[in-house]
């Protein structure tokens, strides 16, 4: 079979290997139909951030069951599934409480083991989520990134009737905007530095948009004055400036969910830190996208929203291609910003 393999120093190549075999009774083999490049893959590709090399990345994928182990009786060849990439131990105290993202002995498809940039993959039954028969198979590759924002909503006890502010209009942010609209947010505001992304956010239902390269935090806060209560802010950009911005614009008693992963140190001034106290903000750390019962209500909600056609995915896709085309699109990101979702279609 073919796969896209990463070596150190940003080398991306297409390789041939044997189709993997099922070795354990709780495993399934998936013939991959669509696999998406995640922003978290970029440090693994270009900054030697993977756990080992060579490695096949890819944790956002969907496909069809090709074979099942003897212990799997609820899935059959031809069934459509999406990847659930985290593999916690399920036995430690954290897992027994349903805190799967805090498992210290976890494995992860496409990071700590080879992933879905390939024609086939063998994974545990627990690592696939059954898709409805009427869902387009490509949509299934978006379930994992959709659940990232939904997990933040879950930790905040929902977004219904709240004034939701999404900072960062990348794929995660744009999906979260659509989910907030679909789940009954009172208002949705999008903040980014790209006018193109903000226009997309507006088309997805954002009531208003702020370009943070053109507006100051006090200006944004002034516009948000009538929406200052019952706020839920999602910081999805993952840069120190946007974390500080979130604190600056937050209304009293706002919830602030930190979703984006920082790759630079964050240094808060005493004045900014003081605003967390004075506004009595609730700061929520949001890590991955799992809850109990496994893999979590987030996954059921994502599936439902897709089935109900509440989410628009096509505008998020920048590139579709088979192995060589996909590999070249990945290489191109070294010279240009990631333009949107890049999909491998084996």
Swiss-Prot record:
Cofactor binding notes: Binds 2 Zn(2+) ions per subunit.
UniProt keyword annotations, A-Z: Galactitol metabolism, Metal-binding, NAD, Oxidoreductase, Zinc
BP-aspect Gene Ontology terms: galactitol catabolic process
Gene Ontology CC terms, in alphabetical order: cytosol
Broad enzyme group: oxidoreductase
CDD domains: sugar_DH
PROSITE patterns associated with the record: ADH_ZINC (PS00059)
Annotated Pfam families: ADH_N, ADH_zinc_N
Family annotation (SMART domains): PKS_ER (SM00829)
GO MF annotations in UniProt: galactitol-1-phosphate 5-dehydrogenase activity; identical protein binding; protein homodimerization activity; zinc ion binding
Chain positions recorded as Zn(2+) 2 binding sites: 89, 92, 95, 103
Family (UniProt): Belongs to the zinc-containing alcohol dehydrogenase family.
PANTHER family: L-THREONINE 3-DEHYDROGENASE
Protein name: Galactitol 1-phosphate 5-dehydrogenase
Organism: Escherichia coli (strain K12)
